[in-house]
């Protein structure tokens, strides 16, 4: 999710890609039988990643496989998948949060058993599901605490301090029903505090203290720069990206309260997609994790989602990221929290957002 923009639902089938698909469909031999090229079908990618358009274009250029990209926030994409579960319209999903994939996996909606032949680092190995139903592509952290250094001389040092009167009406965050990284953050807080009921109590107190909620990272950061809030709790990539580069605010700084939650981004394949499309989805995953694909990930959204921690050996994070060793992190079990996502988001929207 990029820093200061709200995603719009974009269906991309670029002219070159569409023409390629038409040309391939028209490739037949003299006896009317399709040639090998006609085996290429359109791969439908649902994605909430800032570098997805660049990746789709690079993948098509490298393979000739036509791709239709539906770029949107995670919440709406998951709603689309649920609405079309009996007649799926997607082939590959790429969003942040292993909890979302665990939930889909437990519903039987993801292809199992595929793992690309790559050299995982520790983050990658830790993020792999046992049944190989999704593939990690990177890691960010939730939530980073972003603040204006000129207005906040002494930022909070613990999550509990956000409940104090000092920060009444000054804390902003995202809506988990819209923002993919936000449910894992909420689940992480519940995990840290000891359970769902303890987490609900915490967020109820935070709301009573004037919590302000916007849909996604971009609007929440805009609330910070406009002065509506003094503290913004967002995904680390968005927080770091707000501090440098074009359109950034040099007065902003990022702090990590203990603990923050590891947030894997991942790719999952629709179990009900045609075989040809699933095979193309596997090729897409392999390309993303190739040296060429990693270059696209690290350049396609340099002030947003490119600010991730790699999951592959031999790939270093961009220099703007702090050493992960300097941050206290926790990992939540996606198969524990994923099935709870719908219920927790419903509770959050009914009791905290409204």
Region spans (language model):
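Extracytoplasmic ligand-binding site segments that recognize negatively charged/polar headgroups
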Residues: 44-52, 72, 76, 88-228
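A bilobed periplasmic-binding-protein/Venus flytrap-type ligand-binding module shared by bacterial periplasmic
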Residues: 144-151, 187-190, 263-277, 296-299
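A ligand-binding cleft/hinge motif common to bilobed small-molecule-binding domains
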Residues: 99-103, 225, 230-250, 301
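Bacterial lipoprotein signal-peptidase II cleavage site
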Residues: 27-38
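Mature extracytoplasmic/periplasmic domains
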Residues: 270-331
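Short, polar/charged alpha-helical segment
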Residues: 46-68, 79, 242-243
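Conserved C-terminal helix/tail region of periplasmic/extracytoplasmic solute-binding proteins
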Residues: 328-354
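Periplasmic-binding protein-like
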Residues: 141, 201-206, 213, 247-271
